[in-house]
Amino acid sequence: MKGIRNFKEFIKAGIVKIQTPDKSRAEFLIKEAEQGYNYLLEVIEKIGIKNENANDYIKRCYDILMELVRAKMLVDGYNASGYGAHEAEVSYLRTLDFREIDVQFADQMRFFRNGMLYYGTILDKEYAEKVIKFTKENYLKLKKMS
């Protein structure tokens, strides 16, 4: 996995477009993330974390965090689409003053989620626990920014 590019490079490449802020779409994404987060916590409490549900939790965590990043981007007047959009959204975390180690972890989540969706990658309980911890640590921070 190579290092993630700077956000401005995604603008230059046309992957991120500058647009009028879209607060209504951002509000929708925030609400979706909130519902997804609450559901995630409920399912974890009732079912627990196992190897058998690790992939599902990892995908859900990634989606929750990226919905909040997309919401913040929309409020700030940015929209990522097409090939490289997910990488651009992860890169946007740097502009939000996330630590580089957290940007790299989010990029690793993106990489593994892509592997799950397109290549049949199977992840384990241990990694799912790390992802859930990361999500819990960053959910409120992102939500407050959005």
Where are each of the predicted segments found?
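Terminal alpha-helical segments
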Residues: 1-146
